[in-house]
């Protein structure tokens, strides 16, 4: 039984529709975002991610983002047990691309802000001003306990206080090249960073809790959130509304970028068959680890990203919104995503990244109203 594609709930003027950005969430960890031995199995390498991002650039994707993961979930698929490091990967990708925006993720418990400020300024130089930083507080305790740097479980309730000080130091150093910031977590004494970035450095976050959205409203340039459900492209809208309301309190414009997985094929039935096959092989041991870790934070409320990731409804792809269908169906659903007010962009993952980006560029994107402004491609990337 196919999921019906819902009718459009929102409408935007044509000129507003053209603003939607498309990004790729590169597979910095093994097997991407499908926790199943029935899905493609692969290790993360620079060459793989280089091919993915160069192909994305060819098809006019606007940005590429890598996460950071320091310990995986185990299981028979060894899910995310094998990971590259985000800043060094994205520095390499910045050097082999020319137009696409590049974002690395800082695990802020592991890197002092002054070091991140300098690394970001370096990649700004490599990329010619195409670099930005995604800041994460850290939710998976074993990632940090293994290195002896977990600050204690009180951190769950203070992590955005920590991140607030962190970003203030970053802004000082990127803005003036100097910081004398004094806080509960950081003390800067005539700290210097030079050269500074050539353009204002973009900071992004992925807060869905009230505290996370309040942080993004004050300090982020845009905020990532999860899509929800299977073939329910506008179900995330209440989250985008909450982000918009939080930003209104600070007088800033902070749009939402929505995370979706695309599983597409010639027909709805063929795409659905792939999705059901992936789900049938779900790695229960790895999923149990995710569920266990999601329960460690008892202080951040029920609306956090990790709570959604561990929901059993569609845990095989950590419950990101999933668009399953023919190329035309997926294009139509992505136009529905773009119709939601304050949804400024979409971050995509694929079951198979190389073929997925190619079919997106050749078969899906040309059907999308919100991408109709793009030039017609004449030559495929190697």
Curated annotation (Swiss-Prot):
Its EC number is 1.14.99.46. InterPro entries: Luciferase-like_dom, Luciferase-like_sf, Pyrimidine_monooxygenase_RutA, SsuD_RutA_monooxygenase. CDD domains: Alkanesulfonate_monoxygenase (cd01094). The FMN-N(5)-oxide reacts spontaneously with NADH to produce FMN. Requires the flavin reductase RutF to regenerate FMN in vivo. PANTHER family: ALKANESULFONATE MONOOXYGENASE, ALKANESULFONATE MONOOXYGENASE-RELATED. Belongs to the NtaA/SnaA/DszA monooxygenase family. RutA subfamily. This is Pyrimidine monooxygenase RutA. It comes from Shigella dysenteriae serotype 1 (strain Sd197).
